[in-house]
Amino acid sequence: RVIQTDPNFANFRYDRATRKLILLDFGATRPYPAEIVDAYRRLMASAIVGDRSEMSAAASAIGYFRADIGERQRQLVLDVFLHACEPLRHVGAYDFGNSDLAARIRDASLALSTERDSWHTPPADALFLHRKAAGLYLLAAKLKARVDVRALFLPYASRQAPS
């Protein structure tokens, strides 16, 4: 449950002999509480099947929604999550190099910014994790990677994080 949250490409080295990615910089590592890890797992698993109700419950557990959030704002946030989980929702190798996902997330996020009355800053754990996810997406796009993200995630989709 420890994540290195710095998306800088220079923090890693690829070892061709072992075919492993090696982390060089541990300065931005953060422990994540089991309940946050489990809520993100639920969020991603429910996004795969398009279960907006479960996505909403998981996002609430992470801390995305204030108690007074309007339904429109809630749905806009869920739209962004569905976009962000597109590589997970895709069956087979996702083509990061030919994806316009970053632009679509930007556009969906702009819609959120017009609803200032019900917006609040997500918890720091969420912000650091999103920074890392965005960095991984940009790296995969730069490398024109084709990755079956869904197949990588599914074996872990129903596990609970150890306490």
Residue ranges and their predicted role:
Residues V2-F9:
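Catalytic-loop of the protein kinase fold
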Residues A10-Y14:
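Hydrophobic residue at the +6 position relative to the catalytic HRD Asp in the kinase catalytic loop
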Residues D15-S163:
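Helix-rich C-lobe and terminal helical cap/extension of kinase-like folds
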